[in-house]
């Protein structure tokens, strides 16, 4: 049994819900830096979290919108990186790396994929795939390359790092240590912007900001997904094998996966000129 202190400031979900439009990018980046420090510490002792999401990031002592104490919790399914783990898969679909759906083992890079989703959440104020059913079809589309739509509401370098974190190939994702240095650099640049009275603005847009209601079938609690994953991969495999060369070339040209679903990897939701600034 693991006994943890009570964090009266809540978790990252509560922080985003209550402070998205009030916390500056400088404050958000400082908090993000503390989150990646925590993950890096976990990885340094050769542990893989395996269920990393915004509900497992707890806030302690809090200033206005910068949190001095951030703890990564819920290590109940964590394992040593040297321990084989071909067993049941627990988690939340949007935060799970595609290689896990495909039957490969968890690695530190799987946690990094989850961190990329947390970056998206901090950027948009919404949980990934909040408007989708968390079902077999979503698993298949994630394996086809589907990622949440990107908005340009972020400091320079942020989106590029986020996309690297959720790269389909685990080998191409940065380590937690590398992410720390890059987030720190982005944070330093944003501090300079603030000193020059030119901070990155939080833009008011219908595409960002907390939503009052998620899709009722968007399930943001960890659950046993082994059966659903098995069914999804059986269907994904049969669909992939059924396409011919002409269809494959068409899908590649139009940035689509084997199921014929369009990927979102390169789609940008631009902030419109008539949007107001916070």
What label would you give each PLM region?
Residues 1-11:
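Conserved short submotifs of the Hanks-type protein kinase catalytic core
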Residues 18-33:
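Activation segment of protein kinase catalytic domains, centered on the conserved DFG
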Residues 43-60:
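Catalytic-loop of the protein kinase fold
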Residues 86-100:
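Conserved activation segment of eukaryotic-like protein kinases, specifically the C-terminal portion
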Residues 111:
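Conserved catalytic-loop aspartate of Hanks-type protein kinases
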Residues 166-178:
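A conserved short helix/loop substructure at the end of the activation segment
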């Amino acid at each position: 049994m693991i006994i943890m202190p009570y964090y009266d400031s809540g978790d990252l979900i509560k922080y985003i819900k209550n402070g998205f439009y009030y916390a500056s990018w400088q404050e958000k980046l400082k908090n993000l830096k503390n989150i990646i420090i925590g993950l890096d510490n976990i990885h340094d002792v050769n542990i893989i979290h395996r269920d990393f999401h915004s509900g497992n990031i707890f806030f302690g002592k809090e200033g206005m919108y910068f949190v001095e104490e951030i703890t990564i919790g819920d290590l109940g399914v964590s394992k040593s990186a040297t321990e084989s783990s071909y067993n049941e898969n627990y988690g939340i679909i949007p935060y799970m790396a595609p290689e896990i759906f495909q039957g490969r083992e968890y690695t530190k890079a799987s946690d990094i994929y989850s961190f990329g989703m947390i970056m998206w959440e901090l950027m948009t104020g919404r949980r990934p795939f909040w408007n989708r059913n968390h079902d077999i079809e979503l698993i298949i589309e994630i394996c086809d390359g589907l990622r949440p739509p990107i908005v340009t509401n972020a400091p320079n370098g942020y989106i590029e790092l986020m996309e690297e974190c959720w790269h389909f190939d685990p080998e191409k994702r940065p380590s937690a240590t590398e992410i720390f240095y890059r987030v720190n650099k982005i944070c330093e640049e944003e501090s300079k912007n603030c000193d020059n009275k030119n901070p990155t603005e939080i833009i008011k847009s219908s595409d960002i900001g907390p939503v009052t209601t998620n899709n009722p079938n968007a399930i943001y609690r960890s659950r046993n997904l082994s059966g659903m994953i098995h069914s999804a991969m059986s269907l994904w495999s049969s669909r992939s094998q059924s396409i011919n060369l002409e269809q494959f070339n068409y899908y590649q040209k139009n940035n689509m996966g084997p199921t014929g679903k369009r990927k979102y990897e390169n789609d940008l939701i631009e902030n419109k000129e008539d949007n107001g600034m916070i």
